[in-house]
Design a protein with these regions (language model features):
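C-terminal hydrophobic helical "lid"/dimerization subdomain
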Residues: 1-3, 257, 269-273, 315-371
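Mid-domain Rossmann-like dinucleotide-binding core that forms the NAD(H)/NADP(H) cofactor-binding site
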Residues: 138, 152-236, 244
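N-terminal Rossmann-like NAD(P) cofactor-binding module of classical short-chain dehydrogenase/reductase
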Residues: 95, 259, 282
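Glycine-rich beta-strand-centered segment in the early N-terminal region that forms part
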Residues: 25-39, 53-109, 152-154
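Glycine-rich phosphate-binding loop and adjacent beta-alpha segment
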Residues: 206, 223, 228, 233, ...
Length: 371
């Protein structure tokens, strides 16, 4: 076992990541050291990188990133199985959570770990034990209390890497929003989350599934993931016309569920207008604190509409996500979610290429770092 790991350390917006050597910690009896095999650049990572989700960073920087998969490098002495009780050994491929519900607050005691207000900590520097706090490194330390699950052999790392963030997040979000057989679903944003949400909604027998974006390549990919209709913002620049189209495509009713997977709050009011009376708006994309929207409350009252906010998920969703990938691997082109791969040393290039904000188009759906 090496004494150090390589990690990309972030020092703030506008500053390059620096590759540093970081101590590998002693593994707690209930902890697991994981050799990262793929770490994706998530949309929330771009928010932090660009600075529109400001954080107070430690002086020694921050190892961030969370959407990842890997192999067991070392098991704590008390860990013999994964979280479902299946035998686990060093070298096994695993999918795992990246947040740690406290287990003591009201939400946790009410069996709602995804709602735990303490599950995500402020950024910790690489000098703070256990040092390996994020995905953008060649090792990750799963602390005691984290959940991990063995990965089916037929799923490659590039397909598994989104499981613990994008796929689990959208599966849990659609579950919380109450999507039912035959529901009409609007998906705003055809990035990594939106594409996977399209496939999940179709698997839940939603019909029609309508995907809204402004990048033609992503909308074409949305069709490959089952979208019944796609709506290009540039082709239909008027908001009222877009809402009218959604009404037409849903038999004059509107969407049962509309979802924000974009991350810019300007889309929210439009999404709510696309809902039917009694519909539900699922807000996942906008994580930036301080963002504001103009919303007429009577839209909710007279329309009996609901807004549901979701961040992270209950860990039981991960094994279901893995099973879902196995079951649908011949149906949907999962290998196309990761469109670009970079070595860890080229993380600055990967982030610059992944940035789509204020660009007319982009060829990247999701970039993966391969340490």
């Amino acid at each position: 076992m090496p004494a150090t790991a390589r990690a990309a350390v972030f020092f703030g917006p506008g500053k390059p990541f620096e590759i540093r050597d970081v101590p590998i910690p002693e593994v707690d009896p209930n902890g697991v050291l994981i050799r990262v095999t793929a770490a994706n650049i998530c949309g929330s990572d771009l928010h932090f990188w660009r600075g529109d989700a400001p954080l107070r960073l430690p002086e020694d920087g921050w190892i961030f990133g969370h959407e990842m998969t890997g192999r067991v490098a070392k098991l704590g002495s008390r860990i013999k199985t994964d979280s479902l009780g299946r035998p686990l050994k060093e070298g096994d491929r695993v999918a795992y959570t990246y947040f740690y519900p406290c287990g003591r607050c009201y939400a946790c005691l009410n069996k709602e770990p995804a709602a735990c207000p303490h599950k995500l900590e402020r950024p910790l520097g690489p000098s703070t034990p256990p040092h390996l706090h994020g995905a953008f490194a060649d090792h990750y330390y799963l602390r005691p209390g984290g959940a991990l699950f063995a990965v089916p052999a037929e799923l490659p790392d590039e397909v598994v890497a989104p499981v613990n963030c994008a796929l689990a997040q959208v599966m849990y979000g659609l579950h919380v929003a109450g999507v039912r057989f035959g529901d009409r679903v609007v998906i705003q944003g055809a990035g990594g989350l939106g594409l996977q949400a399209t496939a999940v909604a179709k698997d839940m027998a939603a019909a029609p599934v309508i995907v809204v974006d402004q990048i033609p390549g992503r909308l074409e990919l949305a069709k490959a993931f089952g979208a019944d209709h796609t709506l290009n913002l540039k082709d239909v620049p008027d908001r009222r016309e877009r809402v009218k189209l959604v009404r037409e495509w849903t038999g004059g009713v509107g969407a049962d569920v509309a979802c924000d997977f974009v991350g810019f709050p300007a889309v929210i009011t439009e999404g709510i207008e696309m809902l039917r009376s009694g519909g539900t708006y699922l807000e996942i994309g906008t994580i930036s604190r301080g963002a504001k929207i103009e919303l007429e409350p009577s839209l909710l009252v007279w329309g009996s509409k609901k807004i549901v906010g979701v961040i992270q998920y209950d860990p039981w969703i991960i094994p279901r996500a893995l099973d879902f990938l196995v079951r649908t691997k011949a149906r949907w082109p999962w290998d196309r979610i990761i469109s670009h791969k970079y070595p860890l040393e080229k993380i600055n290039e990967a982030f610059a290429a992944s940035e789509w904000h204020k660009k007319e188009t982009t060829s990247i759906t999701r970039a993966a770092l391969i340490p």
